Amino acid sequence: MNMEEDTQSKEIVVAPKKEKKVFRPARSVIKGVPAEIEKDPKLQKAIEVLPSNYNFEIPKTIWRVKQANAKHVALQFPEGLLLFATSIADIIETWTEAETTIMGDVTYGACCVDDFTARAVGADFMVHYGHSCLVPIDQTGSIPCLYVFVDIQFDTVHLIDTIKSVFPSTVPLALVSIIQFVSSLQKMAQDLKSCGYTVCVPQCRPLSPGEVLGCTSPPVPEGHTIVCLGDGRFHLESIMISNPEVPTYLYNPYSKVLSREYYDQPLMKKIRKEIIDKASTAKKWGLILGTLGRQGNTKVMENLKNQLEAAGKDFVIVLLSEIFPAKLEAMSDVEAWVQVACPRLSIDWGASFPRPLLNPYEATVALKHAEWHAQRYPMDFYANESLGEWTPNHKPPCPCGQTRNTGCKGLRCPSSKQGSNKD
């Protein structure tokens, strides 16, 4: 081989490598927080005004604000964390060049992330505290949004010891919690497994493993017993409704009390079915789109509009941030309401309204577009694998008849590709 041939062969070998580099998909790399921020002694001293077992991710927040070159940061807290709002705002303003605005409107959950108001007040960056990233950051418009779950550390040893004293190792357990305690579930599961227990941490995507929302809960394997970590019944009732035959216990990390909990499923279903049946005969409907943060979902609303039109129903659309009986009573000509805001509003308080107030699933049943699930009321509002078009993330079933959980490969599924081919 002469020199020219050798040079050509080397060029041929090198060329593919260059081509790969050119066409490799670009990736967004999030670097760690710089040490000068993470280890800043003055910053650490300032953080001491906050509870030591609450992780507000202050260094990460400061770094993200600096990265975004933000000048105006909107801070959104749930009611239980508002008492820390001014301290956090002071820290952010001290260690960045941004001013802050605390958004004090009521925030019930992750669905209430209010990027609309943040933009309206001129903010160019937003931090939402206390909830998971239910509304993807690519859907919060033109404003960057950082979700801070606020992990809360608690005495996990006490819970494990309590479980060991109450349940024999022959009882399979399912551990779930609100987002603040989710980070502790996997470690506790491993500790219990090492003691001979069968433990699972169920997941309902896109939620984190073990996470429970008031409107979305994972299915629990048959024969298990649920241990739910939290300090109230709202999230607890969600997983109880979703798993009506499963014994459920609530552990309050603050009071360190483990209690057996009950929910009157037959009564709830009886009341809701009677209201659904009453609404099915209504001629004029009111369709409420919730405007509290991102509660209202236009995709779900459009599906309901189509169903109402197909049924020949007269209807009016109303925008409301919060829904009260007196507000709806003022529109006395409306015979039935359906609210696209919080599904639990109808379940928990619907009987307090003088006229039927349905959630999207119940309205779909009333309009004959879905079956009534008498055994298991759906708690799947934000689930990727939801049961019907009454949910924001619902996707029509693949021609293969399976879901991603049972083997479907989504866009890569041969059946999906075949079904999408044009003649």
UniProtKB/Swiss-Prot annotation:
Residues at which [4Fe-4S] cluster binds: 111, 215, 342
Q: Which InterPro entries match?
A: DPH1/DPH2, DPH1/DPH2_1, DPH1/DPH2_2, DPH1/DPH2_3, DPH1/DPH2_euk_archaea
Any one cellular component term from GO for this entry?
Answer: 2-(3-amino-3-carboxypropyl)histidine synthase complex
EC number annotated for this UniProt entry: 2.5.1.108
Catalytic activity reported: L-histidyl-[translation elongation factor 2] + S-adenosyl-L-methionine = 2-[(3S)-amino-3-carboxypropyl]-L-histidyl-[translation elongation factor 2] + S-methyl-5'-thioadenosine + H(+)
State the free-text cofactor note: Binds 1 [4Fe-4S] cluster per subunit. The cluster is coordinated with 3 cysteines and an exchangeable S-adenosyl-L-methionine.
Processing after translation? Polyubiquitinated by white spot syndrome virus E3 ubiquitin-protein ligase WSSV222. This targets the protein for rapid degradation via the ubiquitin system.
Q: Pathway, per Swiss-Prot/TrEMBL?
A: Protein modification; peptidyl-diphthamide biosynthesis
Q: Which UniProt keywords apply?
A: Apoptosis, Iron, Iron-sulfur, Metal-binding, S-adenosyl-L-methionine, Transferase, Ubl conjugation
Pfam families in the cross-refs: Diphthamide_syn
GO MF, one term, reads: 4 iron, 4 sulfur cluster binding
Q: How does the record describe its quaternary structure?
A: Component of the 2-(3-amino-3-carboxypropyl)histidine synthase complex composed of DPH1, DPH2, DPH3 and a NADH-dependent reductase. Interacts with white spot syndrome virus E3 ubiquitin-protein ligase WSSV222.
What functional role does this protein have?
A: Catalyzes the first step of diphthamide biosynthesis, a post-translational modification of histidine which occurs in elongation factor 2. DPH1 and DPH2 transfer a 3-amino-3-carboxypropyl (ACP) group from S-adenosyl-L-methionine (SAM) to a histidine residue, the reaction is assisted by a reduction system comprising DPH3 and a NADH-dependent reductase.
Q: Which family does it belong to?
A: Belongs to the DPH1/DPH2 family. DPH1 subfamily.
Record protein name field: 2-(3-amino-3-carboxypropyl)histidine synthase subunit 1
